[in-house]
Structures are given as C-alpha cells and as structure tokens.
C-alpha cells in the first residue's frame, strides 16, 4: 500500500509558480558589450536616451564611469549639461553638438582608445551615446568598436532603423512604443526578451541632474596623507642657517656605522 506524500509534489509546484516572474528587471550588459543598438521612432529613442543617461548616472560614481554624448540638438539636451559624468580632465564637457566640438572630442576619444590599447590601463569606464553619429562610423575611432569592451568602453547607437546600425552590435534594443520594447542578442537571434519601460520628462531628468551636479567626493589615497615636499630647515629642526652647528654635527656624526637614506618624515 502506497502512502501519498504531499512534499513530493512541492518542488514541481514551486517551479511552475516561479517559472515566470512578473515585473522582473531587464537589463543590457554594457560592461561586456562592444556596442549596443537602439532602434525605434524618434520620440521613443529620446525617451530611452534619457532613461539610460539617468540610470547610469545615479548608479555609478562619476570617477568610475564617464559619458560621451553625440547629439544633434543642443537645446533639446540642455538638461544634461551639468551632469558630472560628462566632465573630463580638461575641464570641458564630453558633448558633441557641432563640427567644432566634434573635432575636439573625437581627437580626445581616439587618443584615449589608443592609450588604452597600448598600455592596457583602464582608469575609468566610458559609455558613448551616439544620437547623431557625426561621421564617427568613418572616423579612425570606428576600428576600436569591435573590441571596445576590452578597452573599457561601450558604444550605444540610436537609429530609426536596424539597417543604419554599425557592425559589432552585441545587443539590439527595439522600441515598439514609448512604453514597450524588446532586446535581442546578436549571437542568438531567437533569444528575444520583451520589456516595459517608463518614460520620464525633461523636467524630471533635469531635476535629477541638478541634484547630482553639486556632489563632490574627495578621493582617499596616499596623496592626501603624505607631504609632497619638505624643506631642509624642517628636516634639520632649525629656524635659521645660524642654528646649524656644523662643527658639532660633524664631530657627533658616525656615518661609518650605517648608510642611511631618507625615506620620509616621522
């Protein structure tokens, strides 16, 4: 006679219950992607552009991730200018909106990619958002797109049709509307995942940028604790040259017992 055990059916019930989870987060892996393509109507592309900029900015320290923007309407993107993630070492913003700014940023970007390729040094991660390509596909920068992830960089191209996307896009995001879309992996075209997203207004995005703009984090390191230089008077504990009794120091010094080398200050 067999005795039924309710626990034997429990694993199958749990599996069926959680086989599909509603409202689970869907993400694109920027860190391991050389390039990501976003396809859709202009309005939907702009909505996704804002979502990506805000999401990356609020989740990552501006010293770890830097953004580069290639846009065609400077006034439309006025809200993003004060974002600290757009700053660079020259004190300017990584925004391309005309030919003059294009030449400067492309030169800096090409130099950075070349430096990383040769030294394998990646001081911070870069996300390049291309809303208007400004000829980047024909620039020497384009030869780095294929292996951009290895150089700590990801390119995100926003186009109205998939045919306009460059090669080497590891993932393609198709925006079906301003609330829905799907993401497809280039390695497996059958691997398509649907998702829903919420668009934010320029005012909301600008408010987030205004909160992030004044944030400053002082980096902790040895440079802040060690002095870069020290005067000879401080080292000898004197205030004037007259305080230095050379005769006494010479007679008391026993340099033959050691070979001292100055390392620092106690």
Give residue spans per PLM region.
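Accessory regions of macromolecular translocation/handling assemblies
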Residues: 1-266
């Amino acid at each position: 006679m067999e005795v039924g055990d309710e626990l034997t059916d429990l694993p199958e019930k749990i599996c069926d219950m959680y086989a599909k989870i509603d409202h689970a987060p869907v993400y694109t892996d920027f860190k391991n992607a050389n390039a990501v393509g976003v396809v859709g109507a202009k309005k939907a592309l702009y909505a996704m552009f804002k979502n990506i900029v805000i999401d990356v900015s609020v989740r990552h320290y501006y010293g770890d991730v830097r953004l580069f923007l290639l846009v065609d309407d400077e006034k439309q993107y006025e809200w993003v200018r004060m974002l600290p993630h757009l700053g660079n070492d020259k004190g300017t913003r990584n925004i391309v909106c005309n030919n003059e700014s294009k030449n400067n940023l492309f030169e800096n970007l090409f130099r950075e990619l070349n430096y990383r390729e040769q030294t394998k040094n990646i001081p911070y991660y870069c996300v390049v958002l291309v809303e208007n390509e400004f000829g980047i596909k024909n620039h020497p920068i384009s030869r780095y797109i294929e292996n951009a992830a290895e150089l700590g960089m990801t390119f995100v191209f926003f186009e109205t049709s998939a045919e306009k996307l460059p090669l080497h896009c590891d993932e393609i995001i198709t925006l079906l509307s301003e609330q829905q879309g799907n993401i497809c992996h280039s390695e497996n075209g059958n691997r398509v995942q649907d998702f829903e997203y919420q668009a934010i207004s320029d005012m909301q995005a600008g408010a987030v940028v205004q909160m992030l703009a004044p944030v400053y984090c002082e980096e902790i390191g040895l440079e802040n604790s060690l002095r870069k230089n020290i005067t000879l008077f401080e080292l000898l504990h004197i205030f004037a040259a007259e305080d230095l009794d050379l005769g006494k120091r010479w007679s008391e010094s026993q340099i033959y017992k050691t070979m001292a080398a100055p390392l620092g200050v106690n």
